[in-house]
Amino acid sequence: MALQLSRFLIFFLYILAHIARSPATSPNSTFLFNSFRQSDLNLSGSATVTRTRALQMTNGQHSMEPGIKGNAFFTASLQFKKPTASKRTKSFSTRFVFTIVSKAHQSGGHGFAFIVAPSPNFSNAMGGRFFGLFSIRNNGNTRNQIFVVEFDIVQQTNLHDIDESHVGVDINGVNPSASEPAAYYTGNRKKEQGVLDSQTPIQAWIEYDGPMKQLNVTIAPLSHQLKPNCTLISRSIDLSPVLLEHMYVGFSFGTQKLVSKCYILAWSFAMDGKVPELDLSHLPLYSSGLYSSVE
C-alpha cells in the first residue's frame, strides 16, 4: 500500500511539474482592448500602461547601444496551427491604433513592430534598429521563428530600408522581405503618402489567409475610419515553416540615439475569424510631446 501511494505521489508531482513548465495557452483566440490595464499584458523593458490606459512602449529617453527597448505581449500563447499532419498555419488578423511622437523636424528611432513569436522573452535583444527583438548575433537566424510587421521611422541603408517612414514584413530578422513607403488609399483609390511619426493616431490592419498563404497590410489615419479597399502590402507568403503550433502576439519598440515615444491606443485580434471592431470614439489620451505627460 505504501509503495502504491509513493508511486501515485511521484506521478502526481510529475504532472504538476509538467503543467508548471508548460506555457499558458489562451482558450480564446479572439480578444479586444479599447484601452489597457497592466494585467492585460506581459510587459518588459520600458513598456508600461499609462494612467489614461494607453500602452506606452518607450519612455522618450535615448541611449547608445544596445539601446532602449519595450515589449508588450498578450499574456497567453495562441494556437496558430492545428495538431494535424499538415501543420498548416491558421488564418489570423489584427487591428490596432498607434501613434509615434518624435522631435519636430527629426525622425525618432527607430519604430515599432507587431510580432508573432514563440516566447515573450527578449531579454538578450537590442533596441534601436533591432526593434527590441533581435541582436547582431541572431539577426536573420532561421531558428528565431519570428514573424514581424515593422513600422519604421529611420532609414537604415545597410538593412535595405526604402525610406525613413515605411512599413515592412520581416522574417526572423530586420531585413524586410517586402516593404512600402507609408501610405493609404482613399475611397477613389487615390494614394496618399503618410508619415508614421505624425504625432496623430494611425490605424493598421494585418491579415493573413492561411489556406491561400496571402498576407495583407493596410494603414490609414484615424480620420479615415473605414479600412481602405486597397492594401499597402499584399504578398504571397507561407508562414507554416516560420510559426510554431503555439505562439505569442504583441508589440516591440526600439530606440537609441534619436528620441521618440510610441503608444498603442487600442488593439484587437482574431484567429480564423473576423477581427473585432475598435471603439475609435473613446481612445485613451496620450502625450503629444516628448517631455510633457498625461501618464
Task: Identify the role of each PLM range.
Residues 2-295:
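Polar, low-complexity loop segments and adjacent catalytic/binding residues used for recognizing
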